[in-house]
Amino acid sequence: VTGSLPTGTELAMALAAMLLNSAAMIALKIMLDRHVGAELRKAMPGKAWLPGVLTGTVAVSLFFVSMVYPPTGIYLPGIKYKYLGVFTANPFHNATYMAARPFAILAFFKYAELMPLYEQDNAHKEYGRDYILFSVYLLLATMAKPSFTIVLVGAAGILMLWRMFHSKFRNFMPTIWLGVCFLPTFADLLYQFRGVFVPQEGQEGGIGFTLGHVWLQYCSNLPLAIGLAVGFPILVLLLNYKELCRDSIYRFSWQIYGMSFLMAFCLYEKGFREMDFNFSWGYMYGIFFAFVGALLVLLRATGKADTKKKKGLAAIQWLAYLWHLVCGLYYFWGFLQGAMYY
């Protein structure tokens, strides 16, 4: 038994992943408290302890949700595997994904917080500390695993360019100042991806364009796969769609998901890396932040639920979340029993 325990490099990687994943839970708890804590305390007078317990429970539980899947032996149409082709917010088998997550969470929230502010006059001076923190968080996430960064940069770039054209370049300098925060990350991305664009072993290199070709090798029913992966966020969106206009963080969470889906569906690495489907890692970050945004909205809606109808709708949404959580706990238990991830 002793010989089967991880030692040396493996043990160090396992401990680092555990500590960083724990840090991600703490980071998410802090962000939930910051953005919905006050509203929950207002909605729960006389129970000062309850909002903190609620956000803490939600923060920890989110790291155990997974895709929804049927019991063993039952197969859904077009779904070949439990994980492959469907994907999950928590790929427990990938240490670098988990290691990058605390920095990804902090970078996501910091950028979402800056979005309503960066176009103000002298925002880069007034919020200079936030600009620096965002740049550092994004760089650290990139150094651990660049998959999240590619998605965030894509979504943020389109959003900032659209705002700049819409304002007829009146916000040109504020856009440049916020763009400077991305420069350290761009340098690291160029270093990490230099091998992708260099042909190896006589094979073509670079990034190719497709329409789901790689994804369809693992799953032939993409609509169902999407529903199994983000069923809970989709339900919250359908019942709270007006929050997209009111809540910039919630809106940005869906922009992140949308960009991650487009990249996974339309892009692939040429050559021997094609079937590795490395753009799926960015998609899994998109799934994770779709859950984060949905939980922010649901926590807020739960606190405001003052009628039987609103309480019933909140309960339905929590049951959908519980479904993902039960599947995730069973999926995690399978890992502990030696089951394969796919």
Regions of interest found by a model, annotated:
Residues 50-115, 221-226, 277-287:
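Membrane-interface micro-motifs in multi-pass membrane enzymes
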